[in-house]
């Protein structure tokens, strides 16, 4: 994600001075670096000037009390001003459960509108909503074929026509059909154009009047940078745009300019597109976004993703964990959960101390491929092996089992043994967790759990981690700090409290 370059430059401007006496001269140098990074990201020069002025006005070295961290105060001030830069200050629309919510997509051709329609349908579908798609784009050749292909891949019901050429008729028929079938989120894709023109706006108005959408989403290409502002204003003047999705933020240096420009029009950005794949779209919330940008993590978002998995509903697994039991089948299910959580980069960026580009796209694909390979090996195991209380011991006593699994999965015995070694490490950690009283009670884990036992668990986790990852987190102290934050977040989340 190229936006991470901006985050890295701002973080670099703030970090090196931690061992330096921070005075007026150092502050000016820091602000210069930060403003240069923002200008390089195509943020409007007036907005950058205002940010610099506000940060400078918020810091008074003479009035600072003794013992206060000047670097922390500057970092907080920069964080707050970046939030102001990206926050339009308008409430975001949310669909209503048990009701047909009609969402109409508008935008220029080539902005990624049709793909984004499917991404949004898939996003709500994963959260338990009954979603569908309507293709009212009759202008672009192949538009219905593209939507049909995307919807089929995402397993989302769709409606369109190869013969009807009136987009208003298609939109009306599709929405009525899906309302009769009690669909909760009905997404209508409309025609785009190569440029803003009256015929486009006229068609959008006709479709809008016919289907009476609850939310009109404007899809915008993030690669045009601050030029997004005039485009967003033009669409807002013609139709009642309530939300914006900015796409293509994974491969262009102008992403910062695009986001700040949209915010300047007071249009709330609800999602950002970070890649071509169906799950490469993230909900946009200003504070968590800036926090991730600066490597400060987003534990609220991480806990939300974990909560979506509904792990607490798996009473059998929770009971096993309490007693320190962990089978190969349990590990397989956890691998499935990891796949459900979405791209690794999104998860990594939510952990404090990690930047969103910690793992490159190539490494991410490689990691997902490795995970799928491990699951393929486990698919070749029988029920007795998957459910054995100590699967690794069973395989070590009978080496022929590993050879059979390798043949069945098209892998080598060495790879099967590596899988079993990973399972042994996981199992050892679970046994330690099972021996810690109060770990599964919920609430304030700091009060429930013996500190020395928690320290041993942290050491066990550190042994399992890639040294590069542990170093990025700030060593053992960084891991312990992250665990404390995670525990505090867990105690405040539904489904993580004791019954």
From Swiss-Prot:
<dbReference type="GO" id="GO:0005829">
    <property type="term" value="C:cytosol"/>
</dbReference>
<dbReference type="InterPro" id="IPR036891">
    <property type="entry name" value="Signal_recog_part_SRP54_M_sf"/>
</dbReference>
<dbReference type="GO" id="GO:0005783">
    <property type="term" value="C:endoplasmic reticulum"/>
</dbReference>
<keyword id="KW-0733">Signal recognition particle</keyword>
<dbReference type="InterPro" id="IPR004125">
    <property type="entry name" value="Signal_recog_particle_SRP54_M"/>
</dbReference>
<dbReference type="Pfam" id="PF02881">
    <property type="entry name" value="SRP54_N"/>
</dbReference>
<protein>
    <recommendedName>
        <fullName>Signal recognition particle subunit SRP54</fullName>
        <ecNumber>3.6.5.4</ecNumber>
    </recommendedName>
</protein>
<feature type="binding site">
    <location>
        <begin position="189"/>
        <end position="193"/>
    </location>
    <ligand>
        <name>GTP</name>
    </ligand>
</feature>
<dbReference type="GO" id="GO:0030942">
    <property type="term" value="F:endoplasmic reticulum signal peptide binding"/>
</dbReference>
<dbReference type="Pfam" id="PF02978">
    <property type="entry name" value="SRP_SPB"/>
</dbReference>
<keyword id="KW-0547">Nucleotide-binding</keyword>
<dbReference type="InterPro" id="IPR003593">
    <property type="entry name" value="AAA+_ATPase"/>
</dbReference>
<dbReference type="GO" id="GO:0016887">
    <property type="term" value="F:ATP hydrolysis activity"/>
</dbReference>
<dbReference type="InterPro" id="IPR000897">
    <property type="entry name" value="SRP54_GTPase_dom"/>
</dbReference>
<dbReference type="InterPro" id="IPR027417">
    <property type="entry name" value="P-loop_NTPase"/>
</dbReference>
<dbReference type="GO" id="GO:0006616">
    <property type="term" value="P:SRP-dependent cotranslational protein targeting to membrane, translocation"/>
</dbReference>
<keyword id="KW-0539">Nucleus</keyword>
<dbReference type="InterPro" id="IPR006325">
    <property type="entry name" value="SRP54_euk"/>
</dbReference>
<comment type="function">
    <text>Component of the signal recognition particle (SRP) complex, a ribonucleoprotein complex that mediates the cotranslational targeting of secretory and membrane proteins to the endoplasmic reticulum (ER). As part of the SRP complex, associates with the SRP receptor (SR) component SRPRA to target secretory proteins to the endoplasmic reticulum membrane. Binds to the signal sequence of presecretory proteins when they emerge from the ribosomes. Displays basal GTPase activity, and stimulates reciprocal GTPase activation of the SR subunit SRPRA.</text>
</comment>
<dbReference type="GO" id="GO:0005786">
    <property type="term" value="C:signal recognition particle, endoplasmic reticulum targeting"/>
</dbReference>
<keyword id="KW-0963">Cytoplasm</keyword>
<keyword id="KW-0342">GTP-binding</keyword>
<dbReference type="InterPro" id="IPR042101">
    <property type="entry name" value="SRP54_N_sf"/>
</dbReference>
<keyword id="KW-0687">Ribonucleoprotein</keyword>
<dbReference type="InterPro" id="IPR036225">
    <property type="entry name" value="SRP/SRP_N"/>
</dbReference>
<dbReference type="Pfam" id="PF00448">
    <property type="entry name" value="SRP54"/>
</dbReference>
<dbReference type="InterPro" id="IPR013822">
    <property type="entry name" value="Signal_recog_particl_SRP54_hlx"/>
</dbReference>
<dbReference type="GO" id="GO:0008312">
    <property type="term" value="F:7S RNA binding"/>
</dbReference>
<dbReference type="InterPro" id="IPR022941">
    <property type="entry name" value="SRP54"/>
</dbReference>
<feature type="binding site">
    <location>
        <begin position="107"/>
        <end position="114"/>
    </location>
    <ligand>
        <name>GTP</name>
    </ligand>
</feature>
<dbReference type="GO" id="GO:0005525">
    <property type="term" value="F:GTP binding"/>
</dbReference>
<comment type="similarity">
    <text>Belongs to the GTP-binding SRP family. SRP54 subfamily.</text>
</comment>
<comment type="subunit">
    <text>Component of a signal recognition particle (SRP) complex that consists of a 7SL RNA molecule of 300 nucleotides and six protein subunits: SRP72, SRP68, SRP54, SRP19, SRP14 and SRP9.</text>
</comment>
<feature type="binding site">
    <location>
        <begin position="247"/>
        <end position="250"/>
    </location>
    <ligand>
        <name>GTP</name>
    </ligand>
</feature>
<keyword id="KW-0694">RNA-binding</keyword>
<keyword id="KW-0378">Hydrolase</keyword>
<dbReference type="GO" id="GO:0016607">
    <property type="term" value="C:nuclear speck"/>
</dbReference>
<keyword id="KW-0256">Endoplasmic reticulum</keyword>
<dbReference type="GO" id="GO:0003924">
    <property type="term" value="F:GTPase activity"/>
</dbReference>
<feature type="region of interest" description="NG-domain">
    <location>
        <begin position="1"/>
        <end position="294"/>
    </location>
</feature>
<feature type="region of interest" description="M-domain">
    <location>
        <begin position="295"/>
        <end position="499"/>
    </location>
</feature>
């Amino acid at each position: 994600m190229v936006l991470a370059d901006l985050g890295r430059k701002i973080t670099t401007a703030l970090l090196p001075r931690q061992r330096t006496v921070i005075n007026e001269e150092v502050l000016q140098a820091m602000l210069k670096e930060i403003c240069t990074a923002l200008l390089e990201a195509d943020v409007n020069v007036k907005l950058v000037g205002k940010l610099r002025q506000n940060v400078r006005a918020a810091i008074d070295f003479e009035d600072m009390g003794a013992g206060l961290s000047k670097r922390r105060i500057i970092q907080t001030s920069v964080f707050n001003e970046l939030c102001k830069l990206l926050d339009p200050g308008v409430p975001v629309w949310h669909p209503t459960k048990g009701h047909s919510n009609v969402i109409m997509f508008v935008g220029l051709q080539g902005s990624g509108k049709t793909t984004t329609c499917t991404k949004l349908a898939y996003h709500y579908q994963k959260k338990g909503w009954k979603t569908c798609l309507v293709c009212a784009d009759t202008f672009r050749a192949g538009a219905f074929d593209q939507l049909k292909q995307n919807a089929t891949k995402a397993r989302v019901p769709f409606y369109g026509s190869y013969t009807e050429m009136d987009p208003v008729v298609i939109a009306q028929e599709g929405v009525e059909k899906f309302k009769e079938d009690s669909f909760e989120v009905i997404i209508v894709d409309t025609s785009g154009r190569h440029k803003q023109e009256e015929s486009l706006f006229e068609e959008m108005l006709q479709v809008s009047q016919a289907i009476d959408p609850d939310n009109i989403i404007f899809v915008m290409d993030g690669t045009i940078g601050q030029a997004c502002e005039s485009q967003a204003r033009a669409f807002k003047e013609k139709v009642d745009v309530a939300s914006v999705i900015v796409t293509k933020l994974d491969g262009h240096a102008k992403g910062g300019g695009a986001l700040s420009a949209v915010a300047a029009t007071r249009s709330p950005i609800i999602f950002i597109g970070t890649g071509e794949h169906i799950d490469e779209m993230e909900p946009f919330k200003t504070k968590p976004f800036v926090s991730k940008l600066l490597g400060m993590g987003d534990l609220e978002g991480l806990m939300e993703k974990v909560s979506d998995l509904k792990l607490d509903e798996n009473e059998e697994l929770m009971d096993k964990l309490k007693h320190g039991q962990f089978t190969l089948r349990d590990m397989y299910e956890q691998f499935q959960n990891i796949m459900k959580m979405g791209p690794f980069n999104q998860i990594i960026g939510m952990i404090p101390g990690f930047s969103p580009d910690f793992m490159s796209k190539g490494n991410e694909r490689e990691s997902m491929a490795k995970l799928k390979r491990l699951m393929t090996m486990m698919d070749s195991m029988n029920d007795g092996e998957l459910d054995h209380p100590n699967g690794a011991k069973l395989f070590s006593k009978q080496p022929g089992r590993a050879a059979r699994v390798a043949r069945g999965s098209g892998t080598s015995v060495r790879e099967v043994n590596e899988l079993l070694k990973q399972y042994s490490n996981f199992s050892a950690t679970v046994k330690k967790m099972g021996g810690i009283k109060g770990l599964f009670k919920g609430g304030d884990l700091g009060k429930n759990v013996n500190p020395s036992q928690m320290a041993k668990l942290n050491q066990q986790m550190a042994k399992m981690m890639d040294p590069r990852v542990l170093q990025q987190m700030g060593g053992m102290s960084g891991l312990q700090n992250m665990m404390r934050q995670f525990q505090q977040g867990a105690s405040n989340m539904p489904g993580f409290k004791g019954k």
